[in-house]
């Protein structure tokens, strides 16, 4: 009997020591991605340097994996084909739901704690307030975009307008920069997009302000956030978080990366901050 007990203890010790028992999930290659809210070349320009930085900081291979649409980032994280994604607020809510509450938000830009959408129209269109959109053609970005669809739709509904009933036509451009170009070209009368993308388009002279400008800006809300799959090794999650938090705008490399993401600082995420996004999605009938 004593021999059997000793054998049981030995087997238990071996099982606990086995790399298969409660093994931390540390992938050979950390696969990062981002919602495709801008054109593919721009996304590669932004995120490839982040992959290089994380490779050095984490001392492991990190690869940026582009995707074709917003849904692919959600499904990719759920299927463990992606390890970390730069989500918009709405897609982060979808990812948390799709992974049964396990996806974990890590860090966001300080601007994302109080993000905004801008509504744009052609000067001389007669559109000055949300109520003027009635009977007009309008462009959102992607269906799954927080700043390009969900929150603009939410504030339109609060203004007692229903886009699908009160607008002449609703279209989806698929990306923030595309929305701006659609309005500028006259393809649609008005549209809504991410305020940081709008500022970048203005600064880089990608839009002509004599042909398109902002007529309304939303109140602030929580938006973009780096999110990992929940079963990723906790120590690795902490190292990823530290790598972003240590980026210093006074340091040349830190400034280069932070400028790519149009921020000066990352801050830790608090899951409670996205409850409002989830409630807005339910109110807009985009989540059940």
Please place each PLM-identified region on the residue numbering:
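Bacterial N-terminal signal peptides that target proteins for export
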Residues: 1-9
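Short helices/loops that flank or line small-molecule/ion binding pockets
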Residues: 71-85, 98-99, 131, 175-196
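Hydrophobic/proline-rich hinge and linker segments of small-molecule sensing/allosteric domains
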Residues: 106-129, 226-229
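Pocket-lining segment of extracytoplasmic ligand-binding domains
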Residues: 125, 136-235
């Amino acid at each position: 009997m004593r021999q059997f007990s000793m054998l049981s203890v030995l087997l238990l010790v071996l099982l606990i020591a086995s790399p298969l028992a409660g093994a931390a999930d540390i992938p050979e290659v950390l696969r990062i991605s981002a919602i495709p809210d801008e054109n593919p070349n721009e996304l590669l320009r932004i995120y490839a340097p982040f992959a290089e930085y994380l490779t050095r900081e984490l001392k492991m291979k990190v690869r940026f994996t582009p995707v074709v649409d917003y849904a692919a980032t959600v499904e990719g994280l759920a299927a463990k084909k992606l390890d970390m994604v730069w989500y918009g607020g709405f897609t982060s809510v979808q990812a948390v739901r799709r992974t049964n509450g396990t996806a974990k938000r890590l860090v966001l830009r300080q601007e994302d704690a109080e993000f905004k959408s801008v509504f744009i129209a052609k000067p001389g269109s007669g559109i000055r307030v949300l109520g003027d959109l009635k009977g007009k053609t309008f462009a959102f970005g992607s269906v799954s975009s927080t700043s390009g669809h969900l929150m603009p739709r939410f504030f339109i509904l609060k203004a007692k307008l229903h886009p699908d009933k009160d607008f002449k036509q609703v279209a989806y451009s698929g990306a923030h920069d595309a929305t701006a170009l659609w309005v500028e070209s006259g393809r649609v009368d008005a549209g809504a997009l991410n305020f940081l993308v709008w500022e970048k388009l203005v600064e880089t002279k990608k839009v002509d302000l004599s042909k398109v400008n902002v007529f309304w800006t939303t109140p602030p809300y929580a938006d973009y956030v780096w999110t990992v799959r929940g079963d990723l090794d906790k120590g690795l999650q902490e190292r990823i978080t530290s790598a972003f938090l240590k980026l210093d705008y006074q340091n040349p490399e830190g400034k280069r990366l932070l400028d790519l993401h149009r921020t000066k600082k990352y801050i830790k995420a608090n899951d409670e901050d996205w409850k409002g996004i989830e409630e807005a999605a339910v109110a807009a009938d985009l989540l059940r």
